[in-house]
Amino acid sequence: SMIGGVMSKG
């Protein structure tokens, strides 16, 4: 995700 991009990129 753009907002929580540290844990999961997508």
Curated annotation (Swiss-Prot):
EC code: 1.6.3.-
Q: Tell me the GO BP annotations in alphabetical order.
A: regulation of defense response to virus
Which keywords annotate this record? Answer: Antiviral protein, NADP, Oxidoreductase
| Enzyme class, broadest EC rank | oxidoreductase
Example GO molecular function term? oxidoreductase activity
Other remarks? Expressed at high levels in BmNPV-resistant strains. Expressed at lower levels in moderately resistant and susceptible strains.
Described function: NADPH oxidoreductase. Has antiviral activity against BmNPV.
Identification of the protein by name: NADPH oxidoreductase
**Which classification does the entry list for the species?**
Eukaryota, Metazoa, Ecdysozoa, Arthropoda, Hexapoda
